[in-house]
């Protein structure tokens, strides 16, 4: 894994990153994808954390991406519990299954922890994230608003 670099995403990277996300998620969970559009819109959200938006480069080419947002969980007692959300993390299709995703995930989580992240919720493939210790939010009584337990 020579010439591997993870750095903060720059505005000049946005188009390349959105194309990468589209390629990475195309026809994975549904016909086509919308993750690239979601990222495009989230960057303008007040809860977007630019300091925690990363790209992974291999020999100067962007092959991976991850980002974080501020969020809250509304507790049953009415409290707001500050958390972060993450993703979608992605790796270029030709580099999937080679350990790059795990490297990017570990790096991203360490930076988020340094930034003050104490809890994290996101949607993703449990087969990938479970290897890093993640489990279902429902195990902690966390659910989408309005959905039954």
Report the location of each language-model feature.
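Conserved acidic functional residues
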Residues: 9, 124-125
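Conserved GNAT acetyl-CoA-binding A-motif
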Residues: 110-124
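Conserved acetyl-CoA pyrophosphate-binding loop and the N-cap/start of the following alpha-helix
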Residues: 95-107, 117
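Conserved active-site tyrosine of GNAT-family acetyltransferases
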Residues: 129, 134
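Conserved acetyl-CoA binding element of GNAT-fold acetyltransferases
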Residues: 78-93
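Conserved N-terminal entry element of GNAT/NAT acetyltransferase domains
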Residues: 1-12, 19
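Conserved catalytic-core motifs of GNAT/GCN5-like acyltransferases
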Residues: 123, 135-149
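Active-site rim helix/loop that mediates acceptor-substrate recognition in acyltransferases
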Residues: 18, 25, 29-67, 72
């Amino acid at each position: 894994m020579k010439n591997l670099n993870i750095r903060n995403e720059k505005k000049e990277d946005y188009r390349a990153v959105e194309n990468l996300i589209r390629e990475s998620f195309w026809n994975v969970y549904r016909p086509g994808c919308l993750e690239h559009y979601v990222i495009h819109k989230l960057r303008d959200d007040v809860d977007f954390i630019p300091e925690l938006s990363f790209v992974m480069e291999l020999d100067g080419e962007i092959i991976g991406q991850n980002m974080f947002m501020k969020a809250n969980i509304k507790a049953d007692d009415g409290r707001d519990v500050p958390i972060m959300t993450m993703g979608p993390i992605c790796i270029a299709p030709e580099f999937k299954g080679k350990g790059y995703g795990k490297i990017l995930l570990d790096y991203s989580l360490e930076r988020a922890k340094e930034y003050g992240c104490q809890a994290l919720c996101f949607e993703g493939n449990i087969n990938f994230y479970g290897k890093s210790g993640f489990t279902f939010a429902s195990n902690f009584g966390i659910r989408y608003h309005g959905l039954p337990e």
